[in-house]
């Protein structure tokens, strides 16, 4: 595939996994995610990687901070809201609604191995821990 062309809204809304990599290019990666009520992405930082998030359905709380232990900004987000997280900023997105939070994310450059599918957050955390070892 030379690139990716598709209905990103449909792709996002139909996704039932915690995280699925849809496309990986040399400088950009597209993933779709689904968070259960009360579930979060998990506080994280990407050194050298900018991240764009867009909520297609649901409501949540975005937390941004300069360090792992600091929340400097909190923002409520819902359908059609976007968030840009610059490289080096600690962040989390928590589903504060009663239904699934459906979103897609762009990483520049790519963050996850091409073809990654994490059915659950626990699976994603285990894979990330294995990468760190």
Give the positions of each predicted feature:
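Conserved short histidine dyad/triad with adjacent acidic residue
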Residues: 31-47
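Short acidic-glycine-tyrosine-enriched beta hairpin
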Residues: 67-87
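A short, N-terminal "cap"/entry segment at the start of jelly-roll beta-barrel domains
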Residues: 1-31, 42, 74-78, 119-133
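Compact, glycine-rich, soluble single-domain proteins
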Residues: 40, 63-65, 71
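Ligand-binding loop in jelly-roll beta-barrel domains
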Residues: 78-79, 87-113
């Amino acid at each position: 595939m030379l690139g990716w062309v598709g209905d990103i809204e449909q792709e996002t809304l139909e996704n039932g996994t915690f995280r699925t990599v849809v496309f990986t290019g040399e400088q950009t990666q597209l993933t779709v995610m689904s968070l259960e009520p009360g579930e979060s992405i998990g506080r994280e930082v990407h050194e050298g990687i900018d991240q764009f998030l867009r909520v297609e359905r649901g409501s949540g709380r975005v937390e941004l901070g300069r360090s792992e232990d600091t929340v400097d900004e909190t923002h409520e987000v819902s359908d059609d809201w976007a968030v840009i997280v610059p490289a080096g900023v600690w962040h989390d997105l928590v589903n504060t609604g009663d239904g699934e939070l459906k979103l897609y994310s762009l990483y520049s450059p790519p963050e996850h191995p091409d073809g990654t599918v994490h059915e659950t957050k626990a699976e994603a955390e285990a894979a990330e821990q294995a990468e760190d070892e």
